[in-house]
């Protein structure tokens, strides 16, 4: 079914404007039959953040911003789905065009600006799937015109706690002016303090929902030191490394499109994001797990990210070029690697190459 979907959809979607193609893909997923996914090999199971993931391959935030198709994505083989980013109030985001393919680089530049339907509508959709099972995280962000961004995050934690498998506090999008300033130590300390207090207030009715922090790949190592220190001292449950980058690697071939303002994702982000996973892993010292995201487009790339320090991984931009069949391909490659090396689980290789990667020259 997935192969047929890719064969029919990929050629058509590539002819469309990138954002129109995304909208059509969402509508197409709504039409897929509700078929149970093939069970995952037990070797792929991951225990992280107090949750049991059937496999380590997740759909990153940004694809299903409004919780329209989380169950369709789970049926296609994802081990978990992250919806959002969601803001308290609906917002339209930045003017179009705001999403650009860099075809020859297998990359994407976006400046979407947290366009979403708002907390009320997204909550209604998630509440409607409450009995479906599966891990569905909620990525939360602040409204662009908010007078108190910390209060926005607190409100979203309180709102979505009954329906979220986990939360991702997104302070690393480059497309909301000033948002990345929340990664600075003093501001981050205040934010996490209030977010975790909010989580604890609703614990009795919603359980102990894990809270993860998503960071930018453009942090300096000194800034990363501060972020990890605050995250550990405040007791977050994990981190996602990383969001899109404002940098433009020297290797880019689509130079004209690369000049578009916004965050770069896809294959050119792989080396930088993987380096940041490794740098974060050595600083975390096992205090909590990491989710690695950025440029994963094959089983080999997924394995590299895991060996850099990621317990779980997420995809998005690579699906634009490889199709949804990439999910099963990555899982098959990871299973084959475990069988070939005589290992029982991926946890045995998480961070195996972190020290080596952090000793390499910085990616440019």
Curated annotation (Swiss-Prot):
Catalyzes the conversion of dihydroorotate to orotate with quinone as electron acceptor. Monomer. The active site is at 173 (nucleophile). This is Dihydroorotate dehydrogenase (quinone). PROSITE patterns: DHODEHASE_1 (PS00911), DHODEHASE_2 (PS00912). It is an enzyme of class 1 (oxidoreductase). Pathway: Pyrimidine metabolism; UMP biosynthesis via de novo pathway; orotate from (S)-dihydroorotate (quinone route): step 1/1. Belongs to the dihydroorotate dehydrogenase family. Type 2 subfamily. Its cofactor is FMN. Its EC number is 1.3.5.2.
